[in-house]
Amino acid sequence: MFKRTVILLAGPTGSGKTAVSLKLAPLVDGEIISVDSMQVYQGMDIGTAKVSLTDRKEVPHHLIDVCHVQESFNAVDFYYHAVQACQDILSRNKVPILVGGTGFYFHTFLSGPPSGPSPDFVLREQLTLEAQERGISALYQELELLDPVYAATITKHDKNKIIRALEIIRKTGSKVSSYAWQSTVNESKEYHCRRWLLSPDPELLRHNILERCDQMLEEGLLDEVQALLAAGIKGNSSASRAIGYREWIEFLDLGSPPDLFEITKQKFITNTWRYTKKQRTWFKRYSLFRELRPMGMTLDDMAKKIAQDYFLCG
């Protein structure tokens, strides 16, 4: 089977992957697919370092602002959205460039989502009627009792996912969370993937993170968190626990005490750095990503290197 080529550009927070991708896209006539578990949410802009609207006009981006903060979005959702975006981009003879730092999403894109039982439309209809009669909150409470692990990954507003989960449980007697993911990353069955990992020196990465956190606060992160609280972000456990949001949600809930500002800021920086180290560990676990060390290279240099590889192998 002939496979179309796509580019994967991964890296930890603060590695410069967004800046490189904006240089790369014009070189290969590409469009960018965000591989970030939080950039899918509307209103989570500053804290997720979303690319600016100006840059999005220059280079089309996909999988940004696709859902409300009260909705859940997981790796399975990402897989189907990303495949659809790839097909759309390729149909216009453009090059998909998947860019981000959510390793599990890259894993899912390469290996596919976990398998599950086939749909039972009769049972689904019964559950839909139950939702109308009892309310979707009652079904969510039932799911929390039967499969608390999976229930914690969605919200009480996710009607379709709640019904599908209960459908699986009632049909098979097994928890949704028991369906295992692939433990290894494989070659995508759909695409020929050129995989790159930006891997800056740890000291440079730490410096970038310090600057990044300061810049987010200067750009109005606290105002953004306040707006998200009004929009109901607490109804989504994943979004409200995201680094850069959970620290400041707690700060605002306490009444924004001035004496806790610096403590909260340091917690924000520390948590970001810890997450970055986890990202680096995750990506280096898989030899399928080719490391690109920025030392001595400009953004243009890195973009050209990836583009040359694409044209040689694409």
From Swiss-Prot:
UniProt similarity note: Belongs to the IPP transferase family.
Region (Interaction with substrate tRNA): 36-39
The protein's name: tRNA dimethylallyltransferase
Record-marked site positions (Interaction with substrate tRNA): T102, R124
Keyword match Signal: no
Its job: Catalyzes the transfer of a dimethylallyl group onto the adenine at position 37 in tRNAs that read codons beginning with uridine, leading to the formation of N6-(dimethylallyl)adenosine (i(6)A).
Keywords: ATP-binding, Magnesium, Nucleotide-binding, Transferase, tRNA processing
Cofactor: Mg(2+)
Residues the entry annotates as binding substrate: T13, G14, S15, G16, K17, T18
Residues that coordinate or bind ATP: G11, P12, T13, G14, S15, G16, K17, T18
Listed GO MF terms: ATP binding; tRNA dimethylallyltransferase activity
Catalytic activity: adenosine(37) in tRNA + dimethylallyl diphosphate = N(6)-dimethylallyladenosine(37) in tRNA + diphosphate
Record's subunit section: Monomer.
Pfam families tied to this protein: IPPT
Species name: Chlamydia trachomatis serovar D (strain ATCC VR-885 / DSM 19411 / UW-3/Cx)
Tree of life domain: Bacteria
NCBIfam families in the cross-refs: miaA
Keyword Transferase recorded: yes
GO annotation terms (biological process): tRNA modification
EC number: 2.5.1.75
Catalytic class of the enzyme: transferase
